[in-house]
Amino acid sequence: MEVKILKVGKNELSLEIKGEDYTLLNLLQKTLLEDKMVEAAGSKIPHRLLETAIFSLRVKGGRNPFDALYEALDRIKAETLEFREAFEKALKEYQAGG
């Protein structure tokens, strides 16, 4: 995966992301939109054969778009860690016959 910053404004940010499809980007979008200070977040893939996506983020009232992105990534990381721990527990129970 490669990420390139295309545009940075006071309340907005656009990224070009190579080697990624909607799977990760939809999760990122959903997580960002849970933040009440995020006005809009979304992605588009201009051509499906190029494997390049454009991700855009717009925040409200002086919120730093980089901070919003970092916080969303931290929440995603925490959720995946929580899932991993729950899965490992379930696997141990299954292997123990329960």
Where are these regions (language model features)?
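Protein-protein interaction/assembly regions in multi-subunit complexes
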Residues: 1-98
